[in-house]
Amino acid sequence: MGNSRSRVGRSFCSQFLPEEQAEIDQLFDALSSDKNSPNVSSKSFSLKALQNHVGEALPPEMVTRLYDGMRRVDLTGKAKGPSENVSQEQFTASMSHLLKGNSEEKSLMIMKMISATEGPVKAREVQKFTEDLVGSVVHVLSHRQELRGWTGKEAPGPNPRVQVLAAQLLSDMKLQDGKRLLGPQWLDYDCDRAVIEDWVFRVPHVAIFLSVVICKGFLILCSSLDLTTLVPERQVDQGRGFESILDVLSVMYINAQLPREQRHRWCLLFSSELHGHSFSQLCGHITHRGPCVAVLEDHDKHVFGGFASCSWEVKPQFQGDNRCFLFSICPSMAVYTHTGYNDHYMYLNHGQQTIPNGLGMGGQHNYFGLWVDVDFGKGHSRAKPTCTTYNSPQLSAQENFQFDKMEVWAVGDPSEEQLAKGNKSILDADPEAQALLEISGHSRHSEGLREVPDDE
């Protein structure tokens, strides 16, 4: 197998396998024979040809960025500026660097997609590139109908989650003096090749998003792109109409933090919109159901939550392990992992008089990093300055917050035990939920009306 030199010449060695290079060559032939570009040599293609091929699959500004990046590739080292059109060598080298290259090669292409001049670029230019890249991912997945059940962009105008995720990706960039790009005061700083290369190396989403944009935008080498662990399948039982707190960008960000074997599917266990504002319903739907993601939106529109690495159980002890984490989605995206200070990862309890009743993650009794009270709709996020378990700041707008929207999603494939529990009534599967319902004075209206399970 190995690398291919197919029709590329001696000055550049493509990193594509022969069958991949054949696809690249076929696309170049289609682009260079575009009938709407009569004045272009058959050995090159124009911006118009690329625009005609892509159509509406990518935003126009990303098509232009990709084209400019290609025509700025100088394989001889003698070019005095960008070429007028894109040659086959330039096209193959660009695709090879962007799809198969190492951090150095990818950073070279990113610099060329940002600026026509050699040398450092401003941080604000990198910010605009990153926002264009993130926005293009949502655009192309929506256009190709590959959102897997999640929403992309609903309201007209700029998508605020695009800017939030772009800011998160940029927050891991280290400037020359070691400072991080954490605010507008750094936007006039210079970013040289070393800064961009280090950023691409440490932030995998940059390379992944470039691959999505090119493979899905150009419809090239799609078999080499596995979207199943990038965008998990969204499952909501019985086809019920349901608008999640999360959009596809939020899900992609959280999903990337999960263990790999749990990234391909999210199944809705509980939604306050569908199941009501009830702590007993919450307990009944989420206990003994395996790893899951809980997310809520407070009255001030802050969106945050946590990942529980194992099944929730109602008991007075802390549970979970160091794979658990807390996260924020709005107003900023961030993940907060365990510190090793204590093992207070997860807590779920009710019906007790001397210890707290509710769902908590991190911190300690009455001082949780995230707390949902048994009086459903109330909670707290206490961190002065940070949560001891996860090093998270206050996640909610107010320390003591109120919320209307909460969701819990099971991630990955359920075990046979979890499937068996899922086929039973909530009250059969979780006697604790039944007890809580009775304690709260609610009768079981469905008692006597349900079908009897096979094992009874």
UniProtKB/Swiss-Prot annotation:
Keywords: Cytoplasm, Lipoprotein, Lysosome, Membrane, Myristate. The keyword Lipoprotein applies. It is found in: Membrane; Cytoplasm; Lysosome. Interacts (via C-terminal domain) with MTOR and MLST8; the interaction with MTOR increases upon nutrient stimulation. One of its GO terms (cellular component) is cytosol. One of its GO terms (biological process) is response to oxidative stress. Its main location: membrane. The keyword Endoplasmic reticulum does not apply. This is MTOR-associated protein MEAK7. Induction: Addition of nutrients and insulin induces its expression (at protein level). Residues 244-412 form the TLDc domain. Coiled coil: none annotated. InterPro entries: TLDc_dom. The gene is MEAK7. A lipid is attached at G2 (N-myristoyl glycine). Activates an alternative mTOR signaling through RPS6KB2 activation and EIF4EBP1 repression to regulate cell proliferation and migration. Recruits MTOR at the lysosome, essential for MTOR signaling at the lysosome.
